[in-house]
Amino acid sequence: QPSFILGFHGCQKSVGEAILSGKERHLKPSEKKWDWLGHGIYFWEGNLTRAWEWARARQTEGKIDEPFVIGAIIDLRHCLDLFDREAMRQVAITHKSLTHAFRKINQPMPQNTGPTPDKAGRQLDCLVMNALHSIRGESGQQPYDSVRGPFLEGEPIYAGAGFRSHSHIQICLRSTACIKGYFRPIGQAS
């Protein structure tokens, strides 16, 4: 995994400007039940275009008045890298433990839902990732500062393709110590 990366975060312009001006120190972590990498601050790794697409889509939905993208220099530090087989093994073991726990209390596990192939409503993944971090904390293991994973999104780019039009790498920062600085991407007016 790379150590230092550039991350891009789509947001409301006032939020980005508050960080760049020093009025706010950091972006606020997301704690939505569908945050597929668990709770934390989300970035697109090296993908300014995708961050802009996301911010503009939120404007179209009426969730952002003025779209903006802020960049960050990120040190992944102790990272749960989902490109790594050992990381995936840890996630699978956590899922198995949760399955047993939910069976014991006779409750159904949350599911990943959504009309798209990427299952945009990722409640199950969020539960598993947050549980993995909790289990590590309870057992005295070193906490992960970040999570890095591939997100397959969009339509196939041609018939029979395994590649999708909006696939990207997402980063979830669990520790703001990973952020070495914020910046305004070139070409973005203040």
Tell where the protein language model's regions lie, with residue ranges.
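Short, solvent-exposed loop/turn segments at secondary-structure junctions
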Residues: 13, 49-50, 77
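Active-site and NAD+-binding cores of ADP-ribose-processing enzymes
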Residues: 2-7, 17-18, 24-26, 69-190
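Short His-Asn-centered micro-motif
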Residues: 9-10, 44-46, 72-73
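A general structural signal for short secondary-structure junctions and capping/turn motifs
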Residues: 32-35, 61-63, 160-163
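Short, well-ordered loop/turn elements at secondary-structure boundaries
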Residues: 1-3, 30-31, 36-39, 65
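Cytochrome P450 catalytic domain signature, combining two hallmark sequence patches
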Residues: 58-69
